Amino acid sequence: MSARTVVLLGSTGSIGTQALDVVAAAPGRFQVVGLAAGGSDLELLARQAVAHDVPVVAVAAGEQDDVAAAIRAAGGRRTEVLTGPGAAADLAGRGADVVLNGITGSVGLAPTLAALEAGSTLALANKESLVAGAALVRAAQQRADQIVPVDSEHSAIAQALRSGARSEVARLVLTASGGPFRGWSREQMAGVTPEQALAHPTWAMGPVVTTNSATLMNKGLELIEAHVLFDVPVADITVVVHPQSVVHSMVEFVDGSTIAQASPPDMRLPIALGLAWPDRVPGAASPCRWDAATSWTFEPVDDAAFPALDLAREAVKASPLHPAVLNAANEEAVAAFLDGRLPFLDVVGTVARVLGEYPDPPDGALSLEGVQAAEAWARARSRALVADGPSRER
């Protein structure tokens, strides 16, 4: 069996570095033919390119000469360098067997579309692609199994769905750790600092995703993602809090059966599945242990304390562009919180204001340019609300 060629977008981030761990642990199974990164850590990108003998690298923010110099300093030689805002999409469109999109944020949409249009299997960790551009992604998708989710929750659902026909599915159940503030009241969360929000109890992730987990906006985005990926109405998608993060999600079938996927929290497992789907990679991650007493608990989400899930449901019902507005406004609000310019509770409060003010999109707006225009409006409005200063709790 020949090695599966892989392009990895977001190689210096959390998903990217773990994906390269998976590749290194399965010699001969995968061949990395392209790496893309934002450009904040050129030394790491260069080391990755040299270690995996990668012929092409793409950098969103950086000069070709600087990237080439970093690769030479790491011991590399003939590496093609792409730079600029469109570099990742250029690389994604070159037709590798698999493109793993581990980019954070809505900038991942264009590379997602490029990979799909090129016919590559898309191992998708960039949930914003589906949140912001669901209709565009569906239009670009060439076959039913072309998108393989890398989020642990959606990977779990994809695995559980193997147990029955789609017509037999009654409900999807997404699990949430509850984040660092599970059980807290809104009053208790009023003074939360970025340091507190970034102290996730079970997962090691980047600052934006970790903050989204603290507000539960991450779960709201995942709810939209599940709705798009599996074509299940949002009314039939339930979110439950599972603090142990061992059961990653479940599928309830019409006969009353519930099929769950369980494993210790380790992103290497869904990453390996994304790269090898529909096959499994032996030893990708450690299994559950059954030689010691343990317990798994589940509890409902406190929607009053964490309104992000309701916002996500409202966005889906409002229009195809409202989810893009939700996501863009949230990215701006999270950045302001991490910079110390916005209180924790006002992150979701700001998103609620922006979402409520967004007008009905004009006819014909459902294009990449239309999505980008909606995002630009949402970012500008979110920044303006942050600059205003007073509390915007919902």
From Swiss-Prot:
Belongs to the DXR family. 1-deoxy-D-xylulose 5-phosphate binds at K127, S152, E153, S177, H200, S213, N218, K219, E222. NADPH binds at T12, G13, S14, I15, G38, N126, E128, G206. Catalyzes the NADPH-dependent rearrangement and reduction of 1-deoxy-D-xylulose-5-phosphate (DXP) to 2-C-methyl-D-erythritol 4-phosphate (MEP). The gene is dxr. It catalyses: 2-C-methyl-D-erythritol 4-phosphate + NADP(+) = 1-deoxy-D-xylulose 5-phosphate + NADPH + H(+). The keyword DNA-binding does not apply. Transmembrane segments: none annotated. It comes from the Bacteria. GO terms for biological process: isopentenyl diphosphate biosynthetic process, methylerythritol 4-phosphate pathway involved in terpenoid biosynthetic process. Keywords: Isoprene biosynthesis, Manganese, Metal-binding, NADP, Oxidoreductase. This is 1-deoxy-D-xylulose 5-phosphate reductoisomerase. Pathway: Isoprenoid biosynthesis; isopentenyl diphosphate biosynthesis via DXP pathway; isopentenyl diphosphate from 1-deoxy-D-xylulose 5-phosphate: step 1/6. Its EC number is 1.1.1.267. Mn(2+) binds at D151, E153, E222. One of its GO terms (molecular function) is 1-deoxy-D-xylulose-5-phosphate reductoisomerase activity. SUPFAM superfamilies: 1-deoxy-D-xylulose-5-phosphate reductoisomerase, C-terminal domain, Glyceraldehyde-3-phosphate dehydrogenase-like, C-terminal domain, NAD(P)-binding Rossmann-fold domains. Its cofactor is Mg(2+); Mn(2+). InterPro entries: DXP_reductoisomerase, DXP_reductoisomerase_C, DXP_reductoisomerase_N, DXPR_C, DXPR_C_sf, NAD(P)-bd_dom_sf.
